[in-house]
Amino acid sequence: MRENNTLDYYKLHTADFVNTTQNVDFHEIQELFLSFLPAKAKLLDFGCGSGRDTKYFIDNGYEVDAMDGSKELCKVATKYTGIKVQHMLFEDFNECNAYDGIWACASILHLKKCELPDMITRLYQALKRNGVIYMSFKYGDFEGVRNGRYFTYLTEESFDMLMKPIHGFMKEKIWVTGDVRQDRGTEQWLNIILRKVTTI
């Protein structure tokens, strides 16, 4: 997350962000993600934000690591989840064969589109064989700063183009949903579940 304005946004609006995300009911997508994983899978919440999803996975018996680029959100999520949330910028992430599942919910959409293939490749490398990743992006064709944060929006077509240089994933599911937060109107999200099927 190289865009300083995005991290500045979360620093200035920590409480508002937590209030609008931490108690949102996201269990349908959480459970769908878990259905692709073995029992007792080891998970990474990549860009955990308020800690909502980390806590859900822990409460359901999974071993979870969590990280975020915002120091302020790391503090909130650590207190909320009961585990130490690691402060790390996305570009500093470098793991290999460590996780059965990676949850990147509304996180890597803060990167530039040109940065996403490298980021997704590094997430691929962090997965064990047959591991699964969930990613979500705002739906559309926009790229740039909006409401104080940098966003890359994607559609099914632009996601497929983005993935062309990346090998070793099988697409399990890709679908569009509405925003589950209140007062978000017709805002839509692109949801993606991929499985690692080969080792690069």
What kind of region is each of these model predictions?
Residues 103-104:
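A conserved beta-strand element that flanks and buttresses the S-adenosyl-L-methionine
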Residues 112, 127-128:
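Helix-to-beta-strand junctions that scaffold the AdoMet/dcAdoMet cofactor pocket
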Residues 1-97, 114-118, 122, 132-200:
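Class I (Rossmann-like) S-adenosyl-L-methionine-dependent methyltransferase catalytic domain
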Residues 100:
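Conserved acidic residues
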Residues 107:
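Hydrophobic adenine-recognition pocket in adenosine-nucleotide-binding enzymes
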